[in-house]
């Protein structure tokens, strides 16, 4: 299937590893020009090399900077003013008991997970509306629906993304611009691998995975962590012109963890 993404310019925030890297790779494979973003020159150059090794003809650009910072977001928009596709992927997570989460952590999570996407959307949405085409995708989480007791501050940010995504879609009614949220479930990313190492006590990953889905996420229908590529496959489609009738949606790629049909 041709997703008609050739020469579309896509920005994926936080795209040097994990789900972001998989999304950037998927978009590049479909012919999009992709801006790779990370906080350091080394992380960006490593990601660029990795994608080029897999896709030699990929058209890639790099931007080093923390897009949770307002001034850096402005710099991004000045350097790349004509983005067609914006994937708000930048985010952090950290399990912590509610009683131990200080105000500073609440603000930090909101700044990175929520305001980064708000700012980039505010910068790029007017241009998309002007040319009557564009795609904005927020990478939320099933944790925005099923708030995890072990990281309530993270769940709060993911719920906020759902509200922002739907609200922005309402402002695009009657245009060729769509705004959607994609909700991954437990996904085996770099961050999750590190999280597993801390919790597993030296157990093999397969053993930990089996126990995790038995005791922590028993509602999962696939009984395993999704791959970053499985998440990216949905995101890349939502970014394409073929997804023109999908707007204002919260699309789950959660392995059936959320026990509802909608």
Predicted regions and their residues:
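Short C-terminal tail/terminal secondary-structure segment
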Residues: 146, 236, 242, 247-262
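Alpha-helical segment proximal to the catalytic Tyr-Lys
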Residues: 126, 170-171, 244
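Short, small/polar-rich loop/turn modules that mediate ligand/substrate recognition or access, typified
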Residues: 173, 178, 246-248
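Substrate-binding pocket helix/loop in short-chain dehydrogenase/reductase
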Residues: 97-98, 105-110, 216
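Active-site helix of classical SDR
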Residues: 121, 157, 165
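Residue(s) in the substrate-gating loop at a strand-loop-helix junction
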Residues: 141
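Conserved glycine-rich cofactor-binding loop
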Residues: 9, 16-17
